[in-house]
Amino acid sequence: MSATARKTAPNAQDIRARKGGVPLVSLTAYTTPMARLMDGHCDFVLVGDSVGMVLHGLNSTLGVTMEMMILHGQAVARGLDRAMLVIDMPFASYEEGPAQAFRNAARLMAETGAGAVKLEGGVEMAETIRFLVKRGIPVMAHIGLTPQSINTLGGYKVQGRDDQAQAVLADARAVADAGAFSVVLEKVPATLADRITAEVAIPTIGIGASAGCDGQILVVDDMLGFFTAFKPKFVKRYADLGPLAEAAIAEYAAEVRARSFPAAEHVFGDQAPAKGAKA
C-alpha cells in the first residue's frame, strides 16, 4: 500500500493522545511482507536501524546509512495501511546539529512517507528535537540504552541504575519538554521506567523497561526467532521460526538432490489443459 493511500493510519498526535490508555503495540519491520503481517495488529511500525544487524549482518547499527533506511522505509510503507510508519534516523545523520537533522529527517519522511522520525539522545538532543518539531517533523525520542552510543556506554548495558537514574529521568523530561510525541525507554530498570511514565506527559514505549509503560516494542526477528546471534533478556520468543525455516530448506535441498522435486504436479505438460483446468 502506498503511503498516499494510507488514510486510516494514526498520526503523531493520535499516538500522543494514547498516554495512559490501552498500551500501544509496536514492532520493527524492514520488508513489505512482514509489514503486511503486522499492519492489523500494531499501532505503529518502526523501520529501525536494527536492520543493519538483522538483515545486513553488521555487528552494530553504526554502519547503517540513509540510503539503507530509505530503501527499507519505502518497502515497509508499501505493506502498511492502518499502522503509523516511524523511521529511525541513522548514526551521523543528525548529531552535528539541528540543520543537519532537519535536512535528513525531511528527506526520510519525504522519500518514505513516514509519519515521524525516531532519534536517540536526551538532554543533548533537546534543542534538535525542538527545532525539528517547530518545522513540522514529529519526533519519537529514544533514551536509556542508545545503541548508536555503545562505544561510549561500554556495550549493551542496563542504563539508569543507582546514580544514573537521575540522568535518565532528566533525559525523559528534556525530550518531552522539547516536543517529542513519545519516548522509547530501552533497557532501564522497571522502577525507573514506571517513574518516568508517571512523570512525563508523553507515552513511554518500553523495550526492556516495564509492563507499566504506555506501550511496548520489540525487534520482530527477535520475537519470531529468526535472529539467533544473541537473545536479549527482555525478548520473549513468541515463535521459534528460525529452526522451522532451516528444516524446510534442508528438506528442499534433499529433495532436489534426490530428484524428487519438482514432482509431476509442479511441472507443465506438452498439451494445453482443458478449459477451466489448472495449467
From Swiss-Prot:
**Bound how, and how many: what does the cofactor note say?**
Binds 1 Mg(2+) ion per subunit.
> EC?
2.1.2.11
Residue positions annotated to bind Mg(2+) are D49, D88, E120
Task: Quote the catalytic activity from the record.
Answer: 3-methyl-2-oxobutanoate + (6R)-5,10-methylene-5,6,7,8-tetrahydrofolate + H2O = 2-dehydropantoate + (6S)-5,6,7,8-tetrahydrofolate
Task: Output the Gene Ontology cellular-component terms.
Answer: cytoplasm
**Compartment(s):** Cytoplasm
* GO process annotations (BP): pantothenate biosynthetic process
Q: Which GO terms describe its molecular function?
A: 3-methyl-2-oxobutanoate hydroxymethyltransferase activity; magnesium ion binding
Q: Which domain of life is it from?
A: Bacteria
Q: In which pathway does it act?
A: Cofactor biosynthesis; (R)-pantothenate biosynthesis; (R)-pantoate from 3-methyl-2-oxobutanoate: step 1/2
What does UniProt list as catalytic? E186
* Residues reported to bind 3-methyl-2-oxobutanoate: D49, S50, D88, K118
Fetch the InterPro entries from UniProt.
Answer: Pantoate_hydroxy_MeTrfase, Pyrv/PenolPyrv_kinase-like_dom, Pyrv_kinase-like_dom_sf
The UniProt entry, under SUPFAM superfamilies, shows:
Phosphoenolpyruvate/pyruvate domain
Signal sequence, start to end: none
Q: What are its cofactors?
A: Mg(2+)
Function, please? Catalyzes the reversible reaction in which hydroxymethyl group from 5,10-methylenetetrahydrofolate is transferred onto alpha-ketoisovalerate to form ketopantoate.
Q: How does it assemble?
A: Homodecamer; pentamer of dimers.
PANTHER family per the UniProt record, alphabetical: 3-METHYL-2-OXOBUTANOATE HYDROXYMETHYLTRANSFERASE (PTHR20881:SF0)
Report what the protein is called: 3-methyl-2-oxobutanoate hydroxymethyltransferase
The organism of origin for this protein: Ruegeria pomeroyi (strain ATCC 700808 / DSM 15171 / DSS-3) (Silicibacter pomeroyi)
